[in-house]
């Protein structure tokens, strides 16, 4: 039994094929395409893959993109299943005012982070709290307490959106290809460093608040296209986990199988 995990963000679709629908399953193949080229999946990326027997995905790019993806899944006559955030599930208690309105990618990433923390917690020890950071078109910074309760989070513009906003709202500034540095001495570096420091500051503030609330230092788990770049400038220890969303989908898929829903 092979399992297909799909993560549709605002810019790209990422997929992973696993040998089973359970945590710790072996990754057989993976890839990513821009949303504009989804129609090529069945003829290119997926053409030579083994036939998956189940799939689960999360999608934040809207119904139209999800339907386009489902058309590609017809290659295998595969019934699509998409995550909707729940009040409780995957080891996470959803503290959002309206739980179903929490972005499914955020919820799935928290499930993946919680699974990772529980695996690394010794017998009889209490899990540590976590800051779950997704660095993409937007940046999300979510707090999970030691009991697995999501207690709140932040949404910020990502690097690209910050730079575009400055380009549109100011005279004489163009989107740069600058570097992140401590003391920028040119406009390109100043813009890139300003965006990076703004995101890093939000994460560090959330870390401080969660530590004050829980009485123990949280772990920061970070994923997304620019995660490695951002982690390098953080003043706090950061674990970059590229598969955080896929790990969450594996846990949720396993729960579906156990409940007889798959």
From Swiss-Prot:
Pathway: Cofactor biosynthesis; coenzyme A biosynthesis; CoA from (R)-pantothenate: step 1/5. Substrate binds at residues 96, 103-106, 187. A monovalent cation. Ammonium or potassium. Coiled coil: none annotated. One of its GO terms (molecular function) is ATP binding. It is found in: Cytoplasm. ATP binds at residues 7-14, 137. The active site is at 105 (proton acceptor). Keywords: ATP-binding, Coenzyme A biosynthesis, Cytoplasm, Kinase, Nucleotide-binding, Potassium, Transferase. It comes from the Bacteria. It catalyses: (R)-pantothenate + ATP = (R)-4'-phosphopantothenate + ADP + H(+). It is an enzyme of class 2 (transferase). InterPro entries: ATPase_NBD (IPR043129), Type_III_PanK (IPR004619). Its cofactor is NH4(+); K(+). GO terms for biological process: coenzyme A biosynthetic process. Its main location: cytoplasm. It holds the Pfam family Pan_kinase. Its EC number is 2.7.1.33. GO terms for cellular component: cytoplasm. Belongs to the type III pantothenate kinase family. Homodimer. HAMAP family: Pantothen_kinase_3. Catalyzes the phosphorylation of pantothenate (Pan), the first step in CoA biosynthesis. This is Type III pantothenate kinase. It comes from Leptothrix cholodnii (strain ATCC 51168 / LMG 8142 / SP-6).
């Amino acid at each position: 039994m092979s399992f297909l995990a799909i993560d549709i963000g605002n810019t790209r679709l990422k997929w992973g094929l696993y040998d089973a629908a359970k945590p710790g399953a072996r990754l057989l193949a993976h890839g990513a395409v821009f949303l504009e080229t989804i129609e090529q999946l069945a003829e290119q990326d997926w053409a030579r893959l083994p036939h998956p027997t189940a799939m689960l995905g999360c999608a934040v790019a809207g119904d139209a993109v999800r339907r386009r993806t489902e058309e590609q899944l017809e290659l295998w006559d595969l019934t699509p299943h998409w995550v909707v955030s729940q009040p409780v599930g995957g080891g996470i208690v959803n503290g959002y005012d309206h739980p179903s309105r929490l972005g499914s990618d955020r919820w799935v990433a928290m499930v993946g982070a919680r699974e990772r923390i529980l695996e690394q917690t010794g017998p009889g020890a209490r899990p540590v709290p976590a800051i779950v950071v997704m660095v993409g078109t937007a940046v999300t910074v979510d707090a999970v307490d030691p009991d697995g309760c999501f207690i709140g989070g932040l949404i910020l513009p990502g690097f690209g959106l910050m730079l575009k906003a400055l380009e549109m709202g100011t005279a004489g500034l163009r989107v740069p290809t600058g570097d992140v540095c401590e003391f920028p001495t040119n406009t390109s570096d100043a813009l890139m460093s300003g965006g990076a420091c703004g995101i890093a500051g939000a994460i560090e503030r959330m870390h401080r608040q969660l530590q004050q609330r829980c009485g123990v230092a949280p772990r920061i788990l970070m994923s997304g296209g620019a995660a490695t770049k951002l982690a390098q400038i953080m003043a706090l220890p950061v674990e970059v986990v590229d598969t955080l969303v896929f790990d969450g989908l594996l846990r949720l898929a396993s729960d579906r199988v156990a409940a007889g829903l798959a």
